[in-house]
Amino acid sequence: QRQMCIRDRGMATGENSSVCVQDFGIDNRTAADGLAVGRASGFVGGLMRPFMSGCYTLQDERMYTLLAQLADTEDLYLEPSALAGMYGPVLTQPGQLLGAYTETALPAGALANATHLVWATGGNMVPREEMQRYYAKGKALAQQ
C-alpha cells in the first residue's frame, strides 16, 4: 500500500506529530489529496483521540473504483479522497478487515441500525476533463 493516513496512525498510537509517512517508507503521493498529510497535527490528534475507536486506509485504486461505481449508480461525482469514507461500512462486516474489531469493541448489535455518514466533498470543484479521467480509470480498474 503506497499511502496511509498518518493522522490515523498518529492518533491510534499516540505518536501524533512525532511520526511522518516517510518514517514508514511511504512516498505520500496519493489521489486522496485532501488526506495527504505527511505529518499529523499533534494538537488535532490529542483532541480527536478520545473520539476515535478505529481507522482504516484505502489504496487509490479502490477510491477510483468507488468513484466510477457511485457515478454509474447515483450520477454523483466526487473527488477520490471523498470516496475513502464510502468503504467503511463494508470493512466493518463480519469476515472483513474491521469485522472482528467491531465485534469486540462495540456492544452486540451496535451497528444493526447504524447510519454511516460520508463527507462527500469536492466533485464540483474538479474540472470536467479531470473527472472524466478519474471515472475512466475507475471503470478500467473495475474490469480487472
Task: Please provide the spans of the model-predicted regions.
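Active-site-adjacent helical/loop segments in soluble small-molecule enzymes
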Residues: 39-111
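Glycine-rich phosphate/pyrophosphate-binding loop at beta-loop-alpha junctions
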Residues: 1-3, 7-50, 107-144
